[in-house]
UniProtKB/Swiss-Prot annotation:
Species whose genome carries this gene: Homo sapiens (Human)
Quaternary context: Forms a DNA-binding heterodimer with transcription factor PBX1.
Keyword annotations of the record: Developmental protein, DNA-binding, Homeobox, Nucleus, Transcription, Transcription regulation
Listed InterPro entries: Antp_homeobox (IPR050296), HD (IPR001356), HD_metazoa (IPR020479), Homeobox_antennapedia (IPR017995), Homeobox_Antennapedia_CS (IPR001827), Homeobox_CS (IPR017970), Homeodomain-like_sf (IPR009057)
PANTHER family assigned: HOMEOBOX PROTEIN HOX, HOMEOBOX PROTEIN HOX-B7
Main location, first listed in the record: nucleus
DNA-binding region in chain numbering: 137-196
Protein's recorded name: Homeobox protein Hox-B7
GO biological process, one term: embryonic organ development
Keyword Transcription: yes
Motif (Antp-type hexapeptide): 126-131
GO cellular component annotations of the record: chromatin; cytosol; nuclear body; nucleoplasm; nucleus
Span list, region Disordered: 194-217
Amino acid sequence: MSSLYYANTLFSKYPASSSVFATGAFPEQTSCAFASNPQRPGYGAGSGASFAASMQGLYPGGGGMAGQSAAGVYAAGYGLEPSSFNMHCAPFEQNLSGVCPGDSAKAAGAKEQRDSDLAAESNFRIYPWMRSSGTDRKRGRQTYTRYQTLELEKEFHYNRYLTRRRRIEIAHTLCLTERQIKIWFQNRRMKWKKENKTAGPGTTGQDRAEAEEEEEE
């Protein structure tokens, strides 16, 4: 037998291409391809018919597959809804949208907090009462009003040394502290001694007694 005989017998088993693709779709499926199975209802005869109908509608003009999504094709063939394909993607996208904005908001909040802290440190003012009051700091000079000075001069004219009780009374009267009254009288006595230096080299007994009484706390 020649090779031509084998070729003729091979092609005679299949119909012509014009008869196979006359409608522009796939040939009709055999019964074994879509056999009904009671355990798999999605692949029954009804689903096979719908799948064949959907496949016939894919190529009405020769290139209509681009206008239909893959989800629609599989949904029509296997009896699934298009929304079932997004059941895993939608929660994942929601989680991403919920996590990423939160991270950016936290980063922005931390940056604003740092900026506010730096601005607060740069604008921090030190008031006089906030400075240290140690012995290394030079103490400012105490100033007295004219009324306070006049009353202290009157008291010094009568008594150059004050008892503690009298110092407390004058401090309450002139709105001063006991320490301020004591310092003023000490300075006034030093001034008075310089003015009256020619009067005598030492102090009298009365002055020493008053000084001892004044130093009692």
